[in-house]
A protein has these predicted regions:
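Terminal amphipathic alpha-helical/low-complexity segments used for targeting or macromolecular assembly
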Residues: 1-59
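Short secondary-structure boundary/capping segments
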Residues: 4-5, 53, 123, 130, ...
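Short cysteine-rich loop/turn motifs with clustered Cys
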Residues: 59-61, 98
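Flexible, glycine/small-residue-enriched loop-and-beta-strand segment within the central core
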Residues: 67-77, 82-150
Length: 168
């Protein structure tokens, strides 16, 4: 089993695997191009996102620059999606964001997990847990969503929150 297959299966994997590092570098190049595009070039930005992300619900998607992600293909967004400036997604595991979601500035979604034991952490092994955001969710500015969290439908997350557990 490759390290990428382990990562996608939620197993412990080497974060410094050559295949994974190469894929990360390729995505960084795409993200760099996206972040340099004119903010008024909605069609061009949408086309790039269609190729980068795993799924886009419709053409009513706006992700303001700058935007950052690790792999892109693990991210699925529903219809009528909006993310403000500095949206960061560490998508080592699937990140599913359903319909009619609004994300404030400086929001981060993390799926990668690291050991709290420094000796183990220094081996550069990690694992990942998926994040799911339901329909009609508003996530306020500067929110951090940690690995393994599910946020239910019709939820508002207040600005500055750190979401560590599921919210029904």
């Amino acid at each position: 089993m490759t390290e990428k297959e382990k990562m996608l299966a939620g197993m412990s994997y080497s974060a410094v695997d050559e295949e994974l590092l190469s894929e990360l570098d390729a995505v960084k190049e795409i993200i760099h191009r996206y972040n340099l595009m004119s903010p008024a070039d909605y069609a061009g930005r949408f086309d790039l996102l269609k190729n980068l992300l795993g799924h886009i619900g419709d053409d009513e998607i706006i992700i303001n620059q700058p935007f950052y992600c690790d792999y892109g293909k693990q991210i699925s967004v529903g219809r009528r999606f909006f993310a403000n400036f500095h949206f960061t997604v560490r998508d080592e595991a699937p990140v599913t964001i359903r319909d009619d979601c609004f994300i404030g500035p400086n929001v981060s979604i993390y799926t990668a997990c690291h050991s709290t034991d420094p000796v183990e952490r220094n081996t550069r092994r990690e694992w990942a847990e998926p994040v799911t955001v339901g329909n009609n969710v508003w996530i306020g500015g500067s929110v951090t969503i940690l690995p393994g969290v599910t946020i239910g439908d019709n939820v508002t997350i207040g600005a500055g929150s750190v979401v560590t557990k599921d919210i029904p």
